[in-house]
Structures are given as C-alpha cells and as structure tokens.
Amino acid sequence: MDYGLTIGITTALRNGGARFAVACVVASVSSLLATAGWSQSLTWLGTLPGSLQSWAHGVAADGRVVVGRAWNSTSRQLRAFRWENGVMQDLGALPGYDQSEAYGVSADGSVVVGRAIDGATGQFRAFRWASGVMQDLGVPPGYDRSWAYGVSSDGSVVVGLATTPAQEARAIRWANGVWQNLGTLGGNRSFAYSVSSDGSVVVGVSRDATQRVRSFRWANGVMQDLGALPGYDQSYAWSVSADGSVVVGWASNAAGQYRAIRWANGVWQDLGVLGNGDHSEAWGVSSDGSIVVGLAYIAPGQSCAFRWTPDGGMEDLNQTYASVLTDGSALVAASAISPDGRYIVGWGINAATGRREAYLLDTGARCTPHSGDVDSNGCVDDADLLAVLFAFGNAGSNLGRVDVNCDQTVDDADLLAVLFNFGSGC
C-alpha cells in the first residue's frame, strides 16, 4: 500500500527491498597490520530458519542487540527478529496476524517496536515487544491500521502512523497506553518515523496544504514545517538526535534528484553524494547529531552504505572498512547507528552465503591519544613501529590506533611518539 508520501527507504521496506538488488561490491583489502583499527569488526547476522534474506533497522546503545526483519521469498512472509549474542530470535506475530517487522529498539535492547501484518487482508497493527510478549498497541479512534517506527530510549514512547479505510494517514505518538494524533501540515497525510531520547520531540513527513511532502518536527503540541533545500521542493525527515535538535533525512525535486540532508539551527545542509552519483538518503544519526549514516548511489541500481561527519564529509563504508569485508561482500545500506556512533547496522551482500543479510559493523572505540602502544599489548616495540610505518601518510577519521595523536593523519608526529617511547613497558 502506498499513501503517496513514501519513496526511498519506505517504498523499499514495503516491497521487500527489491531496489537494493545490486550491491556496491568491493574487493577486500589485505594488509599486514589492518590500519583501520584493532577492535573493528563486521558481523553478518544471518537470517531466520526458512528465510532467505534479512534487514537490520535498529541497534541498542551497546551494540549487543539488533532488530529488523527476515524475508522468505518462497512463502513471501516477513518476520520481525531480535538478534543478541549471535542468535537471531523470531519475535512471532500478534494473534490473527501471520507476519511482522521490527523497526525500533530501546537503548538497552529490551523493547522492540514494529508492526504485525495479516498477509491475506493487508491489515497491519503496531506492536511493542518486551519480556517475550508482543503487545498490540491498537489504533486511535477512527483509524483501522497502525504501524510503529520509532521508540524512546526507555521504551515508554512509541511513534508511527495510523490509517483510515479511506487511506488517510496520520502521524501518531503512543504514551501511557494512549495514541495521540499529531495532525498534519495542512494536507491529509503524515507519518512519524523517529522520536527523541525522552520522547518529547517527533520527526517525520507530512503533506502541506499544496500537497507537497515536507519534513516536520513536532514538539510541545506544535508541528513545525522544516522546509526543504534550495532547489528541492520536498523533504523527508527520517531520524532525530537524542535531544531533538538535529534532524536527518533527504530532499527530492521534480528532476528526480535526491540528497541526504541534515537540519540544525533552522537550516538544512546538503550532505552530498558519493563519487559521481546523484542520489543519497540519510537514515540514522548519532545521539549528538554529529554522525549520519544512510545510502548513496554511485551508479543506477548500485548503492553503498555511507557515513557522514562534519570533518570527513561523506565516506563509503565499503572503502573505510574494506579490511573487514571479504571479496564480493558489500555494505549496501546503513539504516541506524548507536547513540555514540560506534555501531552501525543495515544490510548488504554476504559473499559467503550469496544473499542479502543484515549486518552489525563495530567501527571501534573513538580515537584516544596514547604513547605509541598501537597494538595495546603493554609494550611499545617493533610491531607498533611497523604499524605506523605501514600506515604512514594515511588520513581519515577512522585510522585506529596508528593515529597515535588522533589528528586524523598518520605522520611524523605519530612516528616520533612511538620512537620517543620505544621500549616502554617491555
């Protein structure tokens, strides 16, 4: 069902992700000392028994819990999953429903939200899962369907959408067992996608009085039109920072161009594209609003997961973390990021299984200056010196411990730090 508002990720979510069939495939990079950092790792989450594909849509603060959905293309059924400690759990469905999808998770991973689906009728209902029980959140008065997308850090506030038999849609907010209709920007449809940490700020999209699709930010009972980028007439807000001050999403225009965007201090910023591509979408943002993730197309039908930072701009995660990717594997999209920016989830192509799978990327702890013990074995020795020499000249925001002084460049200063402290702790 398409309510005329959703393109990009939402359309992809509804049709099973078909638009991401072609991946941004890269060859793995081997190096003696994995300059990207010692603690970085990529975990393919697999899929549920009987399912052939999986997508991750949310991650807990510590990266231990990931939620999403798995798809059986034979039976054409979806199931919500919760992954923890290497095990993917099928969350089941509500009574009377045979399918489900999970989109949001609380900070501690204990609460999961999404929707249950009746495959025969197309009926769907928002759910909140906790302590092994899937709760039907019902619908607001006058509505017959509901869908949960986002949840507050403590799991007490849920946001999403409700629809009528006439296919009108409204952004909604659930708290204390009651759904609240957030209204629209003057049109007949609105969707809520994300909520601030404390549940007080909601972002999403709405049609305005002229039927343009616009991003909104709702707070204190007021829905604010966030406008769009110059040269773009529509905007889509998908995620919000912990305090509600930073919003990310994408803008589009009649020419079919899409740009990942970031809103702060009342202004939209164009986050750019990868390579010669002309299409990017931002889907997740860190707690402080400084790190953004999403997807960008480098060619028609060929998308790559990206990360954007104020200093580094937009980077292809397939290149930044090539050392943890095997030949033929690729990170197609990044859908969410942990509050501290360390963990990124999404989906890609796992060459080992030949299928689309959810992934968990641990980018490693943020850079902390040190005395030259690159491999953290307590001794500044030949191994540390070689690590810096092999990485010498590299630049970027994710160099790992070879960037001894954390200035985003492996240079003379890092080499001198190792030499000055050579032999320490040995």
Task: Indicate residue ranges for each PLM-predicted region.
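N-terminal secretory signal peptides that target proteins for export/translocation
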Residues: 1-18
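A general, composition-driven signal for non-globular sequence regions
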Residues: 8, 13, 32-34, 395
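Exposed boundary/loop context
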Residues: 9-10, 30, 371, 401
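Short linear sequence motifs
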Residues: 13, 31, 209, 383-385, ...
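Bacterial N-terminal signal peptides
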Residues: 19-32
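Ubiquitous "structural anchor" signal
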Residues: 25-26, 257, 386, 416
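Conserved "turn/edge" positions that cap or connect secondary-structure elements
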Residues: 35-367
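Cellulosome-associated attachment modules in secreted, modular CAZymes
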Residues: 324, 328, 357, 364-426
